[in-house]
Every structure is written in C-alpha cells, then in structure tokens.
Amino acid sequence: MTTRIAIVGAAGRMGRMLIEAVGEADGAELVAAVDRPGSDFVGADAGELAGIGRLGLAVGDDLEAALAAADVLIDFTLPEATGGVLQACRTTGTALVIGTTGLGEAQLAALDAAAGEIPLVFAPNYSTGVNLTLKLAELAARALGDSVDIEIIEAHHRHKVDAPSGTALALGQRVADTLGRDLKQCAVYGREGRTGERDRQTIGFETIRAGDIVGEHTVLYAGAGERIEITHRASNRMTFAAGAVRAAQWVAGREPGRYDMQDVLGL
C-alpha cells in the first residue's frame, strides 16, 4: 500500500531532502509540496527544487488544499508555524510527522491536544542511529546510577538557531527520567566564572555552533578512574529525512495519539 505524503517547508534545507527521500522510499508517494505564501519557490517544480529532476509537481502555498490529497504531512518548519500546521491537520484529519525543534510549552501543549484527534509522531531527531543512542544513554544511566558525573555535549552548524539542540535535551530527559531526576531542576547550561565544586546530581549541557557541522551528540559518564562516552555523528542530513519518511509510513492510518521515533523503531 502506498503512503501519500505531503511536505510543508518544502523549499527549506530539510524540505528538499525530504522530497528526495520520499522519491527513494518504497511504498511512498509525494502528493504535495508546500511553502509559505509569498515564497519565491511557489510554482517551482518540487523535483527540480530538490535537485532530483522534474517531478511534474508544483510547490504550492495552500496547506489545507495539499492535505486533502495526503495520508500524512511531514513538517520541518519553524516553531511559530506549528500552531497553523496542527490546526490544518486537525481540520482534515491528516496524520502528522513533526521534525521542528525549539517548541515552547504552549506549542507542546497544542501538540498534545491535537494528538487526541489525529495520530502524530514528534521526535527531536529522526535518525535511526540517534534513537539507538537514546536507548544506549538510558542503559548506561541505569547501570552507572549516581556514581558518575554526566555531561551532554552537542555541536551543529553555525545557522542553527536553538540551543541546546532538541536531541541534546531529549538525551538529557532520558537520562534524568532513568535516574529519577527532574531535568528542569538538575540541568546546568554552560559554566562560567567561579562555579564551585560540581554537584553530581546535575546534568551538564555544552553547545558548539560552528561551520557546517551536521550534528554531533556525546553523552559523557565520568567516574573515578574511567569514563564512558556515547557519541553519534551525522555526516549527511539524508539520515534525518529518511527516518522522517519511515515515520510517515508508520503513522499513516494509526489511532490518534502522540508517538515518537522509539515507537516507530520498536525500541
């Protein structure tokens, strides 16, 4: 059975990757590519925009019209667009995959409300490798407990606008949940000046923004005489796009609810 997929944010870096990824996936069909009204790319051929040759599908700017033909929408846009995307999918009953990061509490609450009506997948990262890293981070935290200091270091390209990354926060949340800690209370974001001795109950976050780094995440568990580092490095954004398409094929036709990539992968 073919899954009919629409993409919003089609002219963006990830949008173009998604167009290519849908074309490469078995059992998936791109039925709509949408960009913001007024975009210079509206009317362009989606395939030519993605660099894969002409598809005969023009980029549009009417999201609800695009959803009428789709089983599922993939959204990699900006947090301020999330509310409109959720409302459009609720109106049309369309399943949704959200890859947008940097969502605030109000946007997350709106996402949960939408999950009462439509099936949606929300994940900070759609890479299979990153989601395995989340599982490994949980296993390490469970085994090591409070005997180690835990730091999360992430690096991305200079154009990324949110920090720490959604993936770094997800890693921190997974570790905190495993250890029975409240991440809001124990997270330390960067250090400067005379900080005093480190509190072992804290989870540290360090952020690097430089060059064209696609994405790197390390969870460091440092104890007496040894340390463990769990690291994932992405060398190409196509891994994220392919994972999002996999999630779209998985969520189409599911019961309403909020799912994540761990559900998609059966982890």
From Swiss-Prot:
It comes from the Bacteria. NAD(+) binds at G9, A10, A11, G12, R13, M14, D35, G99, T100, T101, A123, P124, N125, Y126. Pathway: Amino-acid biosynthesis; L-lysine biosynthesis via DAP pathway; (S)-tetrahydrodipicolinate from L-aspartate: step 4/4. GO terms for biological process: diaminopimelate biosynthetic process; lysine biosynthetic process via diaminopimelate. It is found in: Cytoplasm. Transmembrane segments: none annotated. The keyword Protein transport does not apply. NADP(+) binds at R36. (S)-2,3,4,5-tetrahydrodipicolinate binds at H157, G166, T167. Keywords: Amino-acid biosynthesis, Cytoplasm, Diaminopimelate biosynthesis, Lysine biosynthesis, NAD, NADP, Oxidoreductase. Pfam families: DapB_C, DapB_N. One of its GO terms (cellular component) is cytosol. Its EC number is 1.17.1.8. The active site is at H156 (proton donor/acceptor), K160 (proton donor). HAMAP family: DapB. Catalyzes the conversion of 4-hydroxy-tetrahydrodipicolinate (HTPA) to tetrahydrodipicolinate. Belongs to the DapB family. This is 4-hydroxy-tetrahydrodipicolinate reductase. It comes from Alkalilimnicola ehrlichii (strain ATCC BAA-1101 / DSM 17681 / MLHE-1).
